[in-house]
Regions:
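The feature encodes a structural signal of leucine-rich repeats
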Residues: 41, 64-66, 87-90, 110-113, ...
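Surface-exposed, polar helix/loop patches in the mature regions of secreted/periplasmic/lumenal proteins
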Residues: 93-144, 154
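LRR N-terminal entry segment and analogous cap-like coil->beta motifs
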Residues: 27-89, 94-98
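Leucine-rich solenoid repeat scaffolds
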Residues: 154-209
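Leucine-rich repeat
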Residues: 47-48, 69-74, 92-97, 115-120, ...
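Bacterial Sec-dependent N-terminal signal peptides
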Residues: 1-27, 38
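Conserved hydrophobic beta-strand positions in leucine-rich repeat
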Residues: 51-56, 77-79, 97-102, 120-125, ...
């Protein structure tokens, strides 16, 4: 019995290790070497072979440089801490995007065209200035997670209820929601795990803002 348990343990351990290895070496195409580019200039030297781009520094500007939208094979795009005020409407040229991270910018709205990113699974817009999402967010049928903590986001578009059975997590922590605001969101997304800051603390904080 002890011998059988040992074998079972080894099989489970091997399966977990194999899955972890597969997850960390996920490739998006035959020319994908797993590289994450950190320079737009370098990525543009071979635009059809760029699947991951992470930018944390951009020259002072309000929106993304137009050349970025030549990277039509992108699956993962991170533009973090670049002080962007606007997300270009051309974002829908990146039709294969599965992961979009716009953390720590100054975005006040998202364009309606974001709803055309039909393959998007993860949307990160934390630490911006968003007050709501565009109605077109309901078109993102493969979206499983929205990270929007620390935005002045108190209202969700009614259309988002279409994602009730697919959107697993909506992170709204560090947003001073009142009880009625939270309940309205939960009514739209009863099957979604909505993460939020303690409502009582939020109400107190907004009274003093």
């Amino acid at each position: 019995m002890k011998h059988k348990l040992t074998i079972m343990f080894l099989l489970v351990a091997f399966s977990i290790a194999a899955y972890a290895q597969k997850s960390t070496t996920l490739l998006y195409g035959p020319n994908d070497n797993g590289r994450t580019y950190t320079s737009l200039e370098e990525a543009l030297t071979e635009p059809q072979n760029v699947y991951r781009l992470k930018l944390t520094k951009l020259p002072a500007r309000d929106s993304l440089p137009a050349e970025l939208f030549l990277l039509t094979e992108l699956r993962e795009l991170t533009v973090k801490g670049c002080k962007l005020w606007t997300l270009n409407a051309q974002i829908d040229k990146l039709q294969h995007l599965q992961y979009l991270n716009l953390d720590k910018n100054k975005l006040v709205r998202l364009p309606e065209s974001i709803g055309n990113l039909s393959e998007l699974h993860f949307l990160i817009v934390s630490r911006n200035l968003l007050e709501t999402f565009p109605e077109s967010i309901a078109k993102l049928k493969q979206l499983v997670s929205i990270d929007a903590w620390n935005n002045p986001l108190y209202v969700l578009p009614e259309s988002i209820s279409i994602l009730n059975n697919t959107l697993q997590t909506l992170d709204l922590r560090q947003i001073p929601l009142t009880k009625s605001e939270y309940e309205a969101m939960k009514e739209l997304l009863p099957n979604t795990n909505i993460l939020f800051t303690d409502i009582c603390e939020c109400e107190n904080r907004r009274e003093h803002d």
